[in-house]
């Protein structure tokens, strides 16, 4: 597959009060964000509540997203599995519903050494129906993907890249250096999931972002990315300052409660999360709307 780069949306999954996926709102959201210049769609990650949805729901989400996205746009759903067999079965299902790659987190119960991480992902890459993007999100999985493991995996033809949501620029530079030292940088895309540090990640060598903010302000994320790529760093820093303010507002409540409330305020779906997790309260929603209105988001 072509190298992953640019702004890929970490897509929300609109649901009703009972946690049933709202496919009409999902189609509306995909059409909204893909019409604004993003380069890919990543449903069912942390922002998309993939860990909370049943397999049947997840397959239906991928099907709707793939049918709603423009032809040829990468569709990269999240995989949160506890063993290789479970992961491979899920990946095969996604392949049959239009996915083009998968975003795979490490198993999250036992600690994993670098060798164990490499072994797990290598086994998946050897057998999976789709290319892998490794997902480093230690705040949720409690497993940090070791740079040495990622560098070794980067040479695998079925490993396309890594999304780093660790919010640790030191880790990111160590990772990028390890991949470069392994001679695999040309075919392996490091993408950030931390828009508050987007400029720094891009300057360090990341190729783009898979981000929640693109659900709400895709044009702003794209403007930051484009400014860095054009060498307009003063503009990029100013735009990122605004993006940080938006991000701060959208991090209120449990992930991704504020994002759900924000797109509802924009006319897409409702504010509900997948049960048992709770949405923002009416008071919290009013405060969020006030903050986003002051930032010219609403």
Predicted regions and their residues:
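Secondary-structure boundary/capping positions in well-ordered alpha/beta enzyme cores
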Residues: 72-73, 131, 160, 182, ...
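Hydrophobic side chains within alpha-helical segments
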Residues: 19, 61, 93, 166-167, ...
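Generic structural "secondary-structure junction" signal
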Residues: 14-17, 53-55, 111, 139-147, ...
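Alpha-helical structural signal in soluble globular domains
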Residues: 36, 60, 64-68, 93, ...
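A general structural signal for well-ordered alpha-helical segments in protein cores
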Residues: 26, 58, 62, 87, ...
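Catalytic alpha/beta core domains of metabolic enzymes, predominantly
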Residues: 126, 138-251
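Active-site beta->alpha loop and helix N-cap motifs at the rims of alpha/beta catalytic domains
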Residues: 2-144
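C-terminal alpha-helical cap/extension of soluble enzyme domains
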Residues: 3-12, 32, 36-38, 203-206, ...
């Amino acid at each position: 597959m072509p190298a992953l780069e640019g702004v890929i949306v970490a897509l929300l999954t609109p649901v009703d009060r009972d946690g049933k996926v709202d496919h009409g709102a999902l189609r509306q959201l995909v059409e909204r964000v893909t019409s604004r210049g993003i380069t890919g769609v990543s449903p069912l990650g942390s922002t998309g509540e993939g860990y909370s949805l049943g397999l049947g729901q997840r397959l239906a989400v991928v099907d709707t997203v793939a049918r709603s996205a423009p032809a040829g746009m990468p569709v990269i759903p999240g995989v949160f599995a506890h063993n290789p067999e479970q992961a491979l079965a899920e990946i095969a299902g996604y392949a049959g519903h239009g996915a083009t790659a998968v975003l795979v987190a490490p198993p999250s119960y036992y600690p994993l050494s670098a060798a164990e991480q490499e072994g797990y992902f290598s086994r998946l890459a050897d057998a999976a129906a789709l290319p892998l993007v490794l997902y480093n999100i230690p705040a949720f999985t409690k497993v940090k993907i070791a740079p040495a493991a990622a560098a070794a995996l980067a040479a695998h033809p079925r490993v396309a890249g890594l999304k780093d949501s660790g919010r640790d620029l030191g880790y990111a530079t160590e990772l990028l250096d390890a991949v470069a030292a392994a001679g695999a940088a040309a075919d392996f895309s490091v993408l950030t999931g931390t828009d508050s540090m987007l400029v720094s990640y891009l300057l360090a060598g990341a190729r783009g972002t898979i981000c929640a903010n693109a659900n709400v302000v895709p044009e702003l994320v794209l403007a930051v990315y484009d400014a860095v790529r054009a060498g307009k760093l003063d503009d990029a820093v100013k735009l990122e300052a605004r993006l940080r303010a938006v991000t701060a507002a959208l991090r209120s409540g449990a992930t991704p409660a504020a994002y759900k409330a924000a797109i509802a305020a924009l006319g897409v779906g409702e504010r509900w999360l997948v049960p048992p997790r709770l949405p923002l309260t009416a008071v919290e929603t009013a405060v969020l709307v006030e903050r986003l209105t002051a930032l010219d988001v609403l």
